[in-house]
Design a protein with these regions (language model features):
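Short, small/acidic-rich helices and loops at N termini and domain boundaries
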Residues: 1-97
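Glycine-biased, small-residue-rich flexible motifs in mid-sequence functional cores and linkers
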Residues: 1-11, 23, 92-204
Length: 204
């Protein structure tokens, strides 16, 4: 029988298992990973072993009670299957292309990143990347100015980072891609269902 702990056999697979089953931005999860690693954190979530002294016992108990019912090997298996089906890359801290700036988030840093496309953009220096974001219901003037800004930055060799929403985000991507520039789209809803669907062609 496949169990969630048997799937979490190394740091990478354990981080995938944690990310597939737990909420993001969980400080206790981050604290445990920093203290004992992802494999042991998964065992602790499943109810095996004693918590490290670095983690408050009350917080640890509440955390286990919250996450234990969510642990489902099928969820992890499905996440891994979708990763393969969509040709996604899995990045964890320590990988060559992991964006080290995320480490500044400490215990709230992402457990893992799923990436589609060119992963090397993520490890570019911060000064090479510029984030552009704004209203979804943007005016034509707002989209025009966004396009000019993104185009100028692209010609200056910058990588444009934006969400995938309508309006300003989409305008930034289009303007940067038109001359053959590079963009990063941050997809909050996941890479298995590109949203909004009206921007699917742009995002793909």
């Amino acid at each position: 029988m496949v169990t969630i702990t048997s799937l979490a056999k190394d740091e990478r697979s354990a981080r995938v298992a944690l990310a597939a089953t737990l909420e993001p931005d969980d400080a206790v999860t981050g604290r445990l990973i920093a203290a004992v690693g992802a494999v042991e954190t998964m065992r602790l979530a499943a109810g095996t072993g004693a918590f490290p002294k670095k983690v408050d016992s009350v917080d640890a108990g509440l955390w286990r009670n919250k996450v234990s019912p969510r642990l489902d090997a099928r969820t992890v298996t499905q996440a891994l299957s979708e990763t393969d089906r969509l040709g996604l890359h899995i990045l964890i801290p320590g990988d060559r292309d992991w964006p080290t700036a995320l480490n500044d988030l400490g215990e709230r840093a992402p457990t893992v990143l799923w990436v589609r496309g060119t992963v090397s953009f993520l490890s570019a220096t911060l000064s090479d990347r510029v984030t552009i974001t704004g209203a979804r219901a943007a005016t034509s003037y707002g989209e025009h100015i966004t396009g000019e800004l993104a185009s100028d930055l692209t010609h200056a060799g910058r990588i444009i980072v934006a969400g995938g929403a309508y309006g300003i985000d989409a305008a930034a991507h289009r303007a940067a891609l038109a001359p053959g520039g590079q963009t990063l789209a941050v997809m909050v809803g996941g890479l298995d269902r590109l949203y909004p669907s009206g921007n699917r062609e742009l995002l793909e």
